[in-house]
């Protein structure tokens, strides 16, 4: 096939226990933008057991067609079963672009699909776009951008010689479209052909992690600390501020690597992407990999001793000074204001 014969933008719509994950709707929003630019359609792949009724939601969030594989073998995610089905669908449909969430499932499955199709895969993308310019000789070109070299620069990657072009995108990076209730689309049932001789793994039990704390990706207010916070005592100051304003404490990679904060509180390319209403960056210099995880916040306040810190380039309000003095003062002032 000629590369121009590959059409449409396909999204793997991840579901767990019959519930479509938010990242699927986020990817549909971006897929809709890409497809409209290319003059192509958006197709969602929905795999599971007893999930056919969920297809309409995907249409209402931007899909033109939903391909549903609904059978007992797909009740729980197992690498080989899901990979076989997605591989069959992609080979049958020959899409131009395929998008996956950079979740535990997406990160496990997408490389397997890429290897079977002998195509490329760009992981953990922060930006996806179709551009026509001199570099592409005026032809529409799909470009995938992600942090590289430890987050010290942003790399824009193309896949010029093979199809489909594939990317994984972390939850929270892209924005959902407004749901269009009643939107019309096509639901196509797909009957997979399994090679059971390759089913070498059996799911014995699923043990869910007990998460007693709020997921930072869901928080409306985040008070985030970096290397400048220094230690646990420094984070206690941030926690006091967060308690006053109804926020959640998060951190940069440096403080996770130092063992001061747990990984589930990390913001950035190797942590979580967040979009709170308010993001307070305290003692965070602003490495590219951190900015990639928080720059879409509605309002950003940065506190840093270094007036040249990169974090100020994305901040709506910047305070140059010692956070260990500023944060306690701010906390006390806010307490007094709230007591009035």
Model-derived segments and spans:
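N-terminal glycine-rich FAD/FM-binding segment characteristic of electron-transfer flavoproteins
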Residues: 1-340
